[in-house]
Each structure stands twice: as structure tokens, then as C-alpha cells.
Amino acid sequence: MIGILTIQIHFPGCSSLKEKRSRLKPLIHRLQREFNVSVAEMDLHDTWQDAVIACALVNTDAGQIQRTLQSVVAWIEKHWPDVQVVDDQVEII
């Protein structure tokens, strides 16, 4: 089974694409390390204060996928206070 988590993120106070990328890149790398998920920026590439990232996870247990992907969202909200999670959606295929 494949789990896909799509997260819309808001970066308050960002005034350039360079600043947005400098804040987004460490977040992506940290998620990859902490949760062993594949992560990529998927949309809103040219918007200064917003981004959409997707996390993908493969596992045989749908419940484990769901728990892990929900943990990703909770972890972002706890450990990255300068980032606002606007929306998140989990899809299991």
C-alpha cells in the first residue's frame, strides 16, 4: 500500500522566493530523516508565502501508514512554529 500526505503550508513574513526556499528546504530534509518518507514540493512554486508538499510512504499496513502520516503533520506543528499548516490530506492507495 502507498500513503500520500499532501500538506499546504503558509510561511508568514516571507518576502521572497529565496527566503521561502531557505525555510522550506530544511523542513523537507528533516521530514525525510525523522520519518523515512519521500518528500517533494508539489505546487505553489512561485508563491512567496505558500507551498504544497507531498510525503509518500510504502507499507503493508494501512493503519501504520495513517498513523505515520498523521504524525508528520503533528510534528511540523510542534517543531516548526514559524510554519502554519493550512490544510492536510491523507490518501491511501
Stretches with model-predicted labels:
Residues 3-13:
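Short glycine-/aliphatic-rich beta-strand segments at the starts of folded cytosolic domains
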Residues 11-15, 58-61:
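Structural beta->alpha junctions
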Residues 37-43, 84-88:
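A short linear hydrophobic-aromatic micro-motif
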Residues 2, 40-61, 92-93:
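Short, charge-patterned binding micro-sites
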Residues 16, 30-32, 36-40:
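Amphipathic alpha-helical assembly/interaction segments
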Residues 20:
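C-terminal binding/interaction regions
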Residues 25-29, 36, 70:
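Solvent-exposed alpha-helix faces
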Residues 57-93:
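C-terminal structural segments of small proteins and small subunits
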